[in-house]
């Protein structure tokens, strides 16, 4: 590919990310798997300043589940990950949490920043980042094939606590053909800041998952004959901590409805 | 190697780390390059609680220079990285900083924890971790050959600031034969949480290094004909931030005199 062609591909990807964010700002709601391919997507959690230290420490102690890509300081809503973006409006769907309970889903979080002007926002790596490399290697990603949301599960594994925060690990699942599991592990493993290699392959019961066809978040997907469920640490883990710890107030993205950045996936490749 | 042999090798490595820490606790002072081969070593900085958020954010924003391996909460001095270790005594040499100036080097930091009972301690990845894999690949590590401290340099590259903290990037340097630079980059790149791949190869002037034979920290090393200086982000970067930002009080390790943990280097391999 010539430099000129490469520039055009990059510009098109950034433009796709921008267009997606603008459509969400205008009110469109959709899961973001497969949106703006090649651009990194991020999980979001915003907490009052008083909780920011506990959360950043929780993330540091659980880096596979909570790899922090950016922190937006108290009251601010711009990020270095996407020029001109507004974190209060540019995610397709938000969840509002009060005293550890999900109370509402909204498409525009601006009023919540007015209610809590000191929110500190954390943007956390998302496994969607390594889905493009998986697809490029000829590994099917079922929820993209089917146009659905990735299935996510609460597990019986406790994260390492920090301050007032504790909770269980949440995982995402992709069914992978037995012959491609090693490839999927190696490819995703080269992206440690967006969850990296799988935490578990097969045997959902060992993670405390009673029914693989009934995820706690997102949509169930087909598991074909010859495929094994493969589990990756998931950026919904902070929402589990909000629930388990009874955090007084938090705003998060809705699972699968991510913040689409202007950062190419390749940035996180080691 | 049989399982039994592997267990013995591991036990010997943990024992070597423990013996090293005990000797430092007893007062021995030495640079730790090459000590307890295969066990991860860490940079240390302890700051009053009021500065902890700024520092953790600074580390998150400059992950190549400041990859956080553990945070010890206010007033505590034990770490999950080394059972039974005491962070106040088990580093061979400490530096004491007041108002951004180095005022003292001490072998026992216990009185400083009495003076500031709310110190939060950060343990940060160290490039010594990938030196064993470099040696195993037949790449000479000059400062280990010569039994000296690794040379470190302040650069003209500013880190991304956080709160009250700003400062320049500090780098370590290893001269590498031209034919092995790609290997050294790939091998170290597989250890992203201990500084990862080099930030710069050759051309010290571009980093603002006036004289490669006069490092700002550590010892000068020979650069043989056919070798190129290769630069990695360095965990002394927090000390540069302490100086540049005039931090009122901090305790750090002395450059090259690291905290030797019980964690095998391979833990940080992706």
Curated annotation (Swiss-Prot), chains A, B:
Belongs to the D-glutamate cyclase family. Keywords: Lyase. Signal peptide: none annotated. Pfam families: D-Glu_cyclase. NCBIfam families: PRK05463.1. This is Putative hydro-lyase Reut_A2449. InterPro entries: D-Glu_cyclase (IPR009906), Putative_hydro-lyase (IPR038021), UPF0317 (IPR016938). It is an enzyme of class 4 (lyase). Its EC number is 4.2.1.-. The keyword Lyase applies. One of its GO terms (molecular function) is lyase activity. The keyword Transmembrane helix does not apply.
């Amino acid at each position: 590919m010539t430099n000129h062609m490469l520039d055009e591909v990059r510009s098109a990807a950034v433009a796709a990310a921008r267009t997606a964010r603008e459509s969400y700002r205008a009110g469109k709601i959709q899961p973001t798997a497969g949106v703006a391919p090649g651009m990194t997507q991020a999980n979001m959690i915003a907490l009052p300043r008083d909780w920011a230290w506990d959360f950043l420490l929780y993330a540091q102690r659980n880096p596979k589940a909570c790899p922090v890509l950016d922190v937006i300081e108290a009251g601010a809503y711009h990020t270095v990950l996407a020029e001109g973006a507004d974190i209060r409006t540019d995610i397709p769907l938000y969840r509002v949490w009060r005293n550890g309970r999900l109370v509402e889903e909204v498409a525009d979080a601006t009023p919540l920043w007015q209610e809590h002007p000191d929110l500190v926002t954390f943007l956390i790596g998302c496994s969607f980042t390594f889905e493009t490399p998986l697809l490029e290697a000829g590994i099917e990603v079922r929820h993209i094939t089917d146009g659905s949301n990735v299935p996510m599960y609460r597990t019986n594994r406790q994260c390492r606590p920090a301050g007032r925060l504790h909770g269980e690990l949440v995982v995402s699942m992709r069914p992978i053909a037995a012959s491609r599991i090693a490839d999927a592990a190696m490819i995703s493993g080269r992206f440690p800041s967006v969850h990296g290699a799988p935490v578990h392959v097969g045997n959902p019961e060992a993670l405390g998952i009673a029914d693989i066809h009934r995820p706690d978040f997102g949509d169930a997907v087909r598991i074909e004959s010859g495929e094994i469920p493969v589990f990756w640490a998931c950026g919904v883990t902070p929402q589990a901590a909000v629930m388990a710890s009874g955090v007084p107030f938090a705003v998060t993205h809705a699972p699968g409805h991510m913040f689409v950045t202007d950062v190419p996936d390749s940035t996180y490749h080691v």
